[in-house]
């Protein structure tokens, strides 16, 4: 992984919209990835023999299979059994044509969230894949060379956006829910912090901003883990102490409100 030039990028939480796609395209990436639920809500099905390309952009957008990825993440299935199910079900879906399936999840799924899952899933999965005559592992770059791209509007969403969330235009329910007071205040705070960050050049100081602005704070609050949600606010307080922070009072006021929300039952 190190000293390589990646051709694609995985956005945090697979949170994607047209604006992010545009930024990634300008950065020179050839592909990105997001969940297939919003796409399925819009178009009724998900492609297996062509790759979506966002309109007015050259970047391809792979669609991670929510069904198959979560079948690994949230079920007790062995690696060998999973490959055998894939062989059967994909043959039916692809109708004996070549096709592709994107399976994607956090690496922490294996061994951290699911103890012993490297031994029970990963190792036998790779062993069974090596034996298979129907299924093989390939890279996104390989898929870009093999399958045509079709221009289409890729809808906004994340890998935690349900069909119901999408229909209610709540595209990032665990991180930017318009009905969640913690989320609204956190993003108001983040907007203020980003204005300060633009004037910072010192690398050590910039690491404080990186620690402050990450998706776990809003996610933890959404999950009811308020102690962990409030933990990250200490970095915002550290930023408020910088000379460059002209909006110190407003920043501290918002932090106080966020902490009070975390103290509520």
At which residue positions do the language-model features occur?
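Active-site and substrate-binding clefts of carbohydrate-active enzymes
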Residues: 48-59, 63-66, 77-80, 91-265
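Acidic, His- and aromatic-enriched active-site or binding-groove loops in soluble protein domains
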Residues: 1-4, 25-46, 50-60
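Short, solvent-exposed turn/loop segments enriched in Gly/Ser/Thr/Pro and often Arg
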Residues: 8-16, 144
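Binuclear metal-dependent hydrolase catalytic cores centered on His/Asp/Glu-rich metal-binding motifs
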Residues: 72-85
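CE4/NodB-like, metal-dependent polysaccharide N-deacetylase domain
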Residues: 1-11, 88-103
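Distinct, well-ordered alpha-helical segments
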Residues: 17-26
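Short helix/loop capping segments that flank catalytic or ligand/cofactor-binding pockets
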Residues: 19, 41-42, 70-73, 111-113, ...
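Active-site-proximal loop/turn and secondary-structure-junction residues that shape catalytic pockets
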Residues: 13-16, 35-38, 66-68, 107-109
């Amino acid at each position: 992984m190190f000293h390589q030039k990646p051709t694609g990028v995985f956005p945090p939480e697979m949170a994607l919209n047209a604006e992010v796609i545009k930024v990634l395209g300008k950065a020179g990436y050839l592909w990105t990835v997001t969940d297939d639920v919003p796409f399925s809500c819009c178009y009724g099905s998900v492609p297996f023999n062509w790759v979506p390309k966002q309109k007015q952009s050259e970047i391809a957008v792979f669609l991670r299979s929510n069904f198959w990825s979560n079948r690994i993440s949230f079920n007790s299935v062995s690696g060998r059994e999973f490959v055998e199910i894939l062989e059967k079900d994909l043959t039916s879906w692809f109708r004996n044509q070549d096709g592709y399936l994107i399976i994607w999840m956090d690496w922490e799924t294996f061994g951290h969230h699911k103890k012993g899952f490297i031994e029970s899933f990963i190792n036998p999965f790779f062993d069974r894949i090596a034996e298979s005559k129907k299924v093989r592992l390939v890279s996104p770059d390989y898929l870009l060379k093999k399958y045509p791209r079709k221009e289409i509007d890729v809808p906004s969403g994340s890998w935690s956006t349900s069909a119901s969330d999408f229909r209610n235009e709540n595209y990032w329910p665990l991180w930017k829910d318009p009905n969640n007071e913690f989320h609204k205040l956190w993003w108001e705070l983040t907007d203020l912090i980003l204005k300060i960050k633009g004037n910072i050049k010192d690398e050590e100081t910039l690491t404080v901003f990186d620690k402050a602005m990450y998706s776990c704070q809003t996610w933890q609050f959404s999950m009811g883990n308020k102690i962990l949600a409030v933990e990250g606010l200490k970095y915002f307080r550290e930023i408020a102490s910088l000379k460059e922070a002209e909006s110190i009072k407003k920043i501290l006021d918002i932090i106080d409100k966020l902490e009070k929300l975390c103290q509520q039952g």
